[in-house]
Every structure is written in structure tokens, then in C-alpha cells.
């Protein structure tokens, strides 16, 4: 069957060192996985606990470590709660961005940053 997800808890959302250690421990517990998916639920929540510069530095290191190992990292941010400039800087450290919006009651998405995917808004069912 499928392996159990590795869940590590930290004492505080501001504990960036603890998050980094938990990531390393989770990967180490799995041996050398050829496929790993890292989900970072909310950059916006992180920013309630640490300043933008620390958050950016942490996310940059985490995304580089994830990418260097050949893993997939998925990070979410609510762009409506941050300045456009900050959102653009943060998303620049990732390979691509998936944007979601609601238009006339329909949900749409677009992918930016992948050369083989056109950056046009596309409806998707929910």
C-alpha cells in the first residue's frame, strides 16, 4: 500500500528553524524517496508570525532544498492580503504559479511560468 504521510509538528509558526529541522527529519525517515511532495499550506499565515524578509529567506532555502532533491513543493499564498510587489517577489522563487479566481460564479485557473502551458484563464469544475 501507499506509505503513511510523515507529519511533524513544531512549537510555533514562528519557529523557522524547527520547520527546517522537521523537513529534514521527515525526508530522513523516508530513506531516499524518489518522489516526495511538500505542501506548505499558507505563506499568508506564516507572515502573521514572522516578518517578510525572514519568511522570504526561509521559503527560498526550503524551495531550493526541495528542488535540488527533485521533489515537488506546493506553496499557497492569498494574494489579496499582501502587496502585489511582495507577492511577485515571493512567487519569483518558485518555478511556476497557479492562480485561481472566480468570475461570474465560475472558478478559473491559469498557470504562469511553465513554457509548455499557455498562461490563459481556464474554467475548472469544483
Predicted regions and their residues:
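Substrate-engagement module of ASCE P-loop NTPases
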Residues: 57-81
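Phosphate-binding/switch region of NTP-binding enzymes
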Residues: 76-126
Amino acid at each position: 500500500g501507499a506509505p503513511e504521510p510523515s507529519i511533524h509538528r513544531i512549537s510555533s509558526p514562528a519557529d523557522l528553524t524547527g520547520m527546517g529541522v522537521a523537513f529534514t527529519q521527515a525526508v530522513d525517515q523516508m530513506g531516499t524517496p524518489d518522489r516526495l511532495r511538500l505542501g506548505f499550506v499558507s505563506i499568508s499565515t506564516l507572515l502573521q508570525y514572522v516578518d517578510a524578509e525572514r519568511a522570504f529567506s526561509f521559503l527560498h532555502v526550503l524551495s531550493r532544498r526541495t528542488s535540488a532533491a527533485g521533489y515537488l513543493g506546493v506553496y499557497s499564498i492569498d494574494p489579496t492580503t499582501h502587496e502585489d510587489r511582495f507577492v511577485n517577489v515571493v512567487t519569483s522563487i518558485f518555478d511556476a504559479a497557479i492562480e485561481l479566481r472566480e468570475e461570474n460564479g465560475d472558478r478559473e485557473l491559469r498557470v504562469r511560468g511553465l513554457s509548455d502551458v499557455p498562461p490563459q484563464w481556464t474554467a475548472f469544475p469544483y
